């Protein structure tokens, strides 16, 4: 179903279901022979949600059934796992660096099923604010409570749609704009209209005192190339068709959830406002972690640019 200005979702619906796909990929990587990451909570989320297209990453029977129906699906499924593993490792390392730099205030925007508040070694005094749709945060909190999980930091949930006045809600929840913050916008911006993306980073910039950090992945060069998008959509249709036959449910079209619009170049925008910015393309990031996407699979994963930035202290 196409997006609307005021749409909302639970964890198995619309944008919420994409968080399950990401968690399933993290679970598959964690359980692999040579994992880049260790996320013991990812499998818990996937199992609690039941079967869906995300199950093809973690359910060997469903994966075998899908690849029997369409043998060409095995490669793009593995490529997506590699992508999510590298993405997760990159942002894990980012937060370890911010902690080493003395930042004790963390904001995870559209946190979905991010489990870093539970699994990273946060220094004493760290406060992690998670912002997302109310139903998504409730699913995560309830699922982890049922398994006796305890956050490794002070955790503050801020249930709000990022199209609303989230800075006001964040400060009401205890965020202190006079202190440095480590911001994360992972896997978020392509689900926002271009103007909403601009507003998001304007708000982050306004709330960031010197010593703050920011990390995000944003659409990379060629993201809107019509031929590339056509091939990617064809791959996704095949995956949805196989999943629908195996789990006997309607599988939503993820392409309907993205906003294919020209966007402000985030890295340049931040530099213009005094941030020290570094970037890495997806192939560069995968190579850093010993993974790659073969040429035949380049359309399975949209181009991404990974951005990390620091606001100078003087």
Curated annotation (Swiss-Prot):
Uppermost EC category: transferase
Record keywords, A-Z: Methyltransferase, S-adenosyl-L-methionine, Transferase
A Pfam family matched in the record: LCM
GO molecular function terms attached to this record: methyltransferase activity
Residues reported in the UniProt entry to bind S-adenosyl-L-methionine: 132, 161-162
Highest taxon, organism lineage: Bacteria
InterPro entries: Ppm1/Ppm2/Tcmp (IPR007213), SAM-dependent_MTases_sf (IPR029063), SAM_mthyl_Trfase_ML2640-like (IPR011610)
Listed EC numbers: 2.1.1.-
Gene Ontology cellular component terms for the protein in this record: plasma membrane
Gene Ontology biological-process entries: methylation
The protein's role, per its UniProt record: Exhibits S-adenosyl-L-methionine-dependent methyltransferase activity.
Family the UniProt entry places it in: Belongs to the UPF0677 family.
Protein name: Putative S-adenosyl-L-methionine-dependent methyltransferase Rv3767c
Record organism: Mycobacterium tuberculosis (strain ATCC 25618 / H37Rv)
Lineage per the UniProt record: Bacteria, Bacillati, Actinomycetota, Actinomycetes, Mycobacteriales
């Amino acid at each position: 179903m196409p997006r609307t200005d005021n749409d909302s979702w639970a964890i198995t619906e619309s944008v919420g279901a994409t968080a399950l796909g990401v968690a399933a990929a993290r679970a598959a990587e964690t359980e692999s022979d040579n994992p880049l990451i260790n996320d013991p909570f990812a499998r818990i989320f996937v199992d609690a949600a039941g079967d869906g297209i995300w199950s093809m990453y973690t359910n060997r029977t469903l994966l075998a059934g899908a690849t029997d129906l369409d043998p060409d699906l095995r490669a793009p499924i593995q490529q997506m796992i590699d992508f999510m593993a590298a993405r997760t490792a990159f942002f894990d390392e980012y937060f370890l660096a911010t902690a080493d730099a003395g930042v004790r205030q963390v904001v995870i925007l559209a946190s979905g099923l991010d489990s870093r508040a539970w699994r990273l070694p946060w220094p004493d005094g760290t406060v992690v604010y998670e912002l997302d749709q109310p139903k998504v945060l409730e699913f995560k909190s309830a699922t982890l409570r049922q398994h006796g999980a305890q956050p490794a930091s002070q955790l503050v949930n801020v249930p709000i749609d990022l199209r609303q006045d989230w800075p006001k809600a964040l400060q009401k929840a205890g965020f202190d704009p006079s202190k440095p913050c480590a911001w994360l916008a992972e896997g978020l911006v392509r689900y926002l209209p271009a103007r909403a993306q601009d507003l998001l980073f304007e708000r982050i910039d306004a709330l960031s005192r010197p010593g703050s950090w920011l990390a995000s992945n944003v659409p990379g060069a060629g993201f809107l190339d019509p031929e590339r998008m056509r091939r990617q959509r064809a791959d996704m249709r095949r995956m949805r068709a196989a999943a629908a036959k195996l789990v006997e449910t309607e599988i939503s079209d993820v392409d309907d959830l993205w906003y294919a619009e020209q966007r402000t170049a985030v890295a340049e925008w931040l530099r213009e406002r005094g941030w020290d910015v570094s970037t890495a393309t997806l192939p560069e990031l995968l190579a850093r972690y010993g993974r790659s996407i073969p040429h035949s699979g380049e359309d399975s994963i949209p181009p991404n640019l990974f951005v990390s930035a620091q606001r100078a202290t003087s």
